[in-house]
Amino acid sequence: MRDIHPVSKPCVYNCVTCKKEFIIDSAAKNTEVAIEVCSNCHTFFIGKQNATTTLRGRAEKLNNRFEAGLNNINKKPEKKKIQGKSEPRKSLNEL
């Protein structure tokens, strides 16, 4: 059982957005790998999250939906306003 481990060699990971390079030992065949987002430019790691990227739990989402449903139930439905009279319907013989 000799020589069963893969050969590891240095591989360069290039971030496409911020142009930063990481050199990591890897068993990959390529010597260069392009990645889209790294720890230098991802919003989670740099602390610039907005409301859409903030992580929320399932229970909080369920509570928000439940409260929205209760608010809709408690509202009285608005009456539709009639905007003038429309023409009476014609029968097939009249057309």
UniProtKB/Swiss-Prot annotation:
Keywords: Ribonucleoprotein, Ribosomal protein, RNA-binding, rRNA-binding. GO terms for cellular component: ribonucleoprotein complex; ribosome. Residues 80-95 have a biased composition (Basic and acidic residues). One of its GO terms (molecular function) is rRNA binding. The keyword Ribosomal protein applies. One of its GO terms (biological process) is translation. The keyword Transferase does not apply. Residues 68-95 are annotated as: Disordered. Signal peptide: none annotated. It holds the Pfam family Ribosomal_L31. Binds the 23S rRNA. Belongs to the bacterial ribosomal protein bL31 family. Type A subfamily. Part of the 50S ribosomal subunit. This is Large ribosomal subunit protein bL31.
